[in-house]
């Protein structure tokens, strides 16, 4: 029932895009430049994982490339990302004796996505996990923690690596270094106001940019036309911080819900590409991160305890002291479960002991102290003291912990079917820690429809729009209904690189 309703909504959105295209075509023709202020081979819009990867590959293929970023600093959401990346087959995984394969990763992505994914892309993504990891290390010089391997919700086994600095900046800064080395200008405060499509050939040939744009001041900056002799590559990300647009897609995602995204995650280029005639699908599948902490704004740092310590090595319980979900289920299942608990007047908590936080301390040195200092989590000497301090019934909480400890000893969780990893130990060593849980709007699964090399499809004829490519969160049909945590970086780098290579090969 849910899927069919969403399919109807998606069809309606596409129909609206076609009508919008017809209504704006004449205006676009009238505005088409007679001359251009600047000319490049490839113009990349967006400076996150995907955009920078596309720029690097296009430049290496011989193209004259420029990257445009509307915000004052580069990186977008990528630079504040948690720095965890799926790396099936990596040394960290093998050192822990974890059995994994591209086929298992592919299955996990499809199951979480309710098989709404583009299967060819999912297969390519899974097969690219190890080569992508090696590319980031060997080509970019990214440093990952050598002995840390983690498991996000929905994955069958631990398979993500963590950047040495515990942030997506550990990758983005290396991409920016490579751009500088290759001579690729990354221009900030560049707001793309319009994408030009030749009224005769239908080819995308450039953009209208407001140079010196001051976010969020509409109309600021000097208008400049830029020609793309080969292609424009769209890597503009999602719209999680555009409340009006996200509520249009999913009315449940009101302003009451915080977002993990940077302020510039807005919808203007989603609207512009619809007007251009680009096909978009699954726009109403918008993910909320279940591990958010309500006592800080945005992504923050509290999620690191809620996910890395408690979901992977501890427990999630409600204010009655009971588990309410498999802590390693996919993000939608967990976020929905939290929303049900909150609707019924019960708070949700992430809890763990000294052993639970040990892997997080290794992955993210200093994070525990920062969370305690900011009162995002609270430390107690004993489980009983935690129960007393939070109002959770101690007898129920102790029973919940005891039951889980037995599951750890049995290496099987019959109640919630959670994966018990091979280094999990019972929860019994103080001190104890607790943090509150609340979902935050996080990722857009829908977006532009592309082929395997990032060519954007037209809504009228299902054929590629000449000169237009896309990658990253601006695209749809890769993750389907739910994106698995730690797969975003893999997606952005793999398909960003492919789009950049293909764009540079345009005649």
Question: Across the structure, where does each feature detected by a protein language model lie?
Answer:
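Glycine-rich FAD pyrophosphate-binding loop
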Residues: 61-78
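A glycine-rich dinucleotide-binding beta-alpha-beta segment and adjacent secondary-structure elements
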Residues: 396-482
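Beta1/beta-strand and adjacent pyrophosphate-binding region of the FAD-binding site
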Residues: 36-48
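Conserved redox-cofactor binding core of oxidoreductases
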Residues: 127-223, 229, 242-244, 293-294, ...
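Glycine-rich loop(s) and the adjacent beta-strand/alpha-helix scaffold that form part
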Residues: 214-296, 495-498
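A conserved FAD-binding loop/helix module that cradles the flavin
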Residues: 254-261, 477-503
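An anion/pyrophosphate-binding glycine-rich loop and adjacent beta-alpha core
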Residues: 270-274, 279-392
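N-terminal secretory signal peptides and thylakoid transit peptides that target proteins
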Residues: 1-15
